[in-house]
UniProtKB/Swiss-Prot annotation:
The chain crosses the membrane at residues 13-33, 38-58, 69-89, 93-113, 121-141, 152-172, 370-390, 407-427, 431-451, 459-479, 482-502. The keyword Ribosomal protein does not apply. Belongs to the aromatic acid exporter ArAE (TC 2.A.85) family. This is p-hydroxybenzoic acid efflux pump subunit AaeB. Forms an efflux pump with AaeA. Could function as a metabolic relief valve, allowing to eliminate certain compounds when they accumulate to high levels in the cell. It comes from Salmonella agona (strain SL483). It is a multi-pass membrane protein. One of its GO terms (biological process) is carboxylic acid transport. It is found in: Cell inner membrane.
Length: 655
């Protein structure tokens, strides 16, 4: 397929994007809005953003969700702008500098919250800056300007959502159903590999792939939840299935590790059972029935705990999977599974990275302010807006440098494209609403094709072109103003790119160390006799951290193995029958405090000191377990955990 070819699967979304732009344009001019450009720009960004992220037509609900986030972010930004202006109207320079800090603060928050919700915070940062810059000449019009911006953005979002509904968006439900079946087969094949105890690299690749697929399934669940309220029951089941899938991975990998020291625990009966190849979910179902009969016949005590737990989790997975596919009423048995354990949310390990993003956004906005004041350029404010937009949106993504390059390419492409519309097309079509709508529909259609291909610069070109062509009411054609706006966009993107290059993000190694120490803390916190604490489900949070570690350090198998070993230790200690007495309870609290000190230590020396203290306390704890006659189900996991911490002490303490 050539560079400029059009695939059939791309046409529907391209028509949808063109329809959203035309609807926003028509409503903006029909109701005599002062700046219809905002409505058109919003419709284009809200519709095209999810398509660019997905690399194709987004699933149902994605555009609505992004639209709601944009509304929330706009209102937060407008309120912040009003507060800043009312408080500092007599000091314009201070007012702009505070807005720069506000943009940085919003970027800091957006780096810490879930990636799905970070868009709202990034948007609120540059919305306040846009309002403050725009009202510099007429500050008394601030409330009216904020109200107009909110109204036109809501209109643009409404047009994008309406266009999405008109062209029957894709449902993700069938993808979810297929992935649930495929995932269970892959889980069974992982357990086969672990019982064979073959090549460790093959096992690592298999469980790593399953971790990624389980994370992708959780993303599908979020999409399905946004799609329609009729999937509420399926959403509840999928939440539990996420935990069950992670449990299956953990039990399989623990089975592999156990055979490193005690291969005799896996009897020949189970080895023969797992030798049978499976291709479909029906094959897995038949094998599980055979295993349950064998477990009943041999007895729970004669079955390795990892296999017993794995078969139980796989059986519950099958039950909930059928419920997701049929979306029927939740049965009493399913309700018992769903009411299981409260899920603990993960604490962000990227606080240093978030602080780097804060300084990048704040410094780039301040640099733009100084450039504007020093040059006195009429479009310096436009450059400032682009700086805020680029840094606010780029910082929350894994590769902000490439986002900046995308914007630079887009603004460069927008100059000749905008010139064509400004000098030729719009002057000749402004007297006819039909021709004006058709001309912008053509723009939206062809850029919509490129957006789905994730063409570098396509998103930036769409937004930048709409921003510089004359879509105001009334239309005025001043070439110098057009050229200033176009050049302001390019200069703003360049300045943002320079700041991102100069303010280096060296937080990667620190984030990796914090993540590994959080795994250690989770394993230590599992040593407790508190009933409420033992019921907490930390597995999704731990695997979310493992997924982040895999993305930060692709191919670093020692780190992945260490993290997985800590997760296995956490799960085993969580279920271990620890003796209940006051002496051990007090010591559990002491262990948790020391583990927290390891995470929060500000220097390598402090971290080594607290880590050494933790190792000493674990030795004392093992002695206490011996005194209180704890069973092997407790002493062996604690001994393995202590040995792992001694072995990897340097990796867990050095920056």
């Amino acid at each position: 397929m050539g560079i400029f070819s059009i695939a059939n699967q791309h046409i529907r979304f391209a028509v949808k994007l063109a329809c959203a732009i035309v609807l926003a344009l028509f409503i903006g001019f029909h109701f005599q809005l002062e700046t219809p450009r905002w409505a058109v720009l919003t419709a284009a960004i809200v519709a095209a953003g999810p398509a660019f992220a997905a690399g194709g037509e987004p699933y149902s609900g994605a555009i609505r969700y992004r639209g709601m986030l944009r509304i929330i972010g706009t209102f937060i930004g407008c309120i912040a702008a009003l507060i800043i202006i009312i408080s500092m109207i007599r000091a314009p320079l201070l007012m702009i500098l505070v807005c720069c800090v506000w943009a940085g603060f919003c970027t800091w928050i957006s780096s810490l919250v879930r990636i799905e919700n970070s868009y709202a915070w990034g948007l609120s940062g540059y919305t306040a800056l846009i309002i403050v810059i725009t009202i510099q000449t007429e500050p008394l019009l601030t409330p009216q300007f904020a109200l107009e911006r909110c109204s036109e953005i809501v209109i643009g979002i409404g047009c994008a959502i309406l266009a999405d509904l008109l062209f029957s968006p894709r449902s993700i439900k069938q993808e979810v159903d297929r992935e649930l079946d495929s995932l269970l087969v892959a889980q069974y094949q992982l357990m086969q590999l672990c019982i064979k105890h073959g090549d460790s690299e093959e096992v690592d690749n298999a469980w790593g792939d399953l971790v990624r697929r389980t994370a992708a399934l959780e993303g599908m669940r979020s999409n399905l939840n946004m799609e329609s309220s009729r999937w509420v029951r399926a959403n509840r089941r999928l939440k539990a299935l996420n935990t069950l899938s992670l449990t299956l991975i953990t039990q399989s990998c623990e089975t592999y590790l156990i055979q490193n020291t005690r291969p005799e625990l896996i009897t020949d009966t189970f080895r023969e059972l797992f030798e049978t190849p499976v291709e479909t979910v029906q094959d897995v179902h038949r094998q599980l029935k055979r295993m349950r009969r064998v477990i009943v016949w041999t007895g729970e005590r004669e079955t390795p705990v990892t296999l017993y737990s794995w078969v139980g989790a796989a059986t519950r997975y099958l039950l909930l999977k059928r419920g997701v596919i049929s979306n029927t009423k939740i049965s009493a048995t399913e309700e018992e599974i769903l009411q299981g354990e409260p899920v603990v949310k993960v604490e962000s390990a990227e606080r240093h990275h978030a602080m780097v993003n804060f300084w990048r956004t704040t410094l780039s906005c301040i640099l733009g302010t100084l450039f504007w004041l020093w040059t006195g350029w009429t479009s310096g404010n436009g450059a400032m807006v682009m700086i805020a937009v680029v840094t606010s949106l780029a910082m929350r993504l894994p590769n902000p440098r490439m986002v900046c390059i995308d914007f630079i390419y887009g603004t460069l492409a927008a100059l000749p494209l905008g010139l064509l519309y400004f000098l030729v097309i719009i002057p000749n079509t402004q007297q006819s609403m039909l021709l004006l709508c058709l001309s912008l529909a053509v723009l939206g259609f062809f850029i919509g094709i490129e957006v789905q291909k994730r063409r570098l610069g396509s998103m930036g070109a769409l937004a930048s072109t709409i921003n510089i062509i004359v879509l105001d009411n009334p239309m005025t054609f001043h070439f110098s103003q057009f050229l200033d706006s176009a050049l302001g966009q390019i200069v703003g993107c360049m300045l943002a790119f320079i700041v991102i290059l100069l303010v280096r993000d060296k937080s990667k190694d620190r984030t990796g160390r914090v993540l590994l120490n959080q795994f250690v803390s989770a394993a230590v916190s599992a040593m407790t006799t508190n009933v409420v604490r033992r019921k907490e489900n930390r597995l999704p949070a731990l695997y979310q951290q493992l997924f982040l570690l895999m993305n930060k350090f692709p191919g670093d198998l020692p780190k992945f193995r260490l993290a997985l070993t800590m997760i296995i230790a956490h799960q085993r200690l969580r279920d271990a029958p620890i003796p209940v007495n006051e002496d051990l309870s007090v010591f559990h609290r002491q262990l948790r405090r020391t583990a927290d000190h390891v995470i929060s230590a500000g220097s390598d020396d402090k971290r080594r000191r607290y880590f050494g203290l933790l190792l000493d306390e674990l030795d004392i704890y093992q002695e206490k377990l011996r005194i209180w006659e704890a069973p092997p189900q407790v002493t062996e996991p604690v001994k393995r955990l202590t040995g792992m911490l001694h072995k990897y002490q340097n990796a867990l303490t050095d920056s």
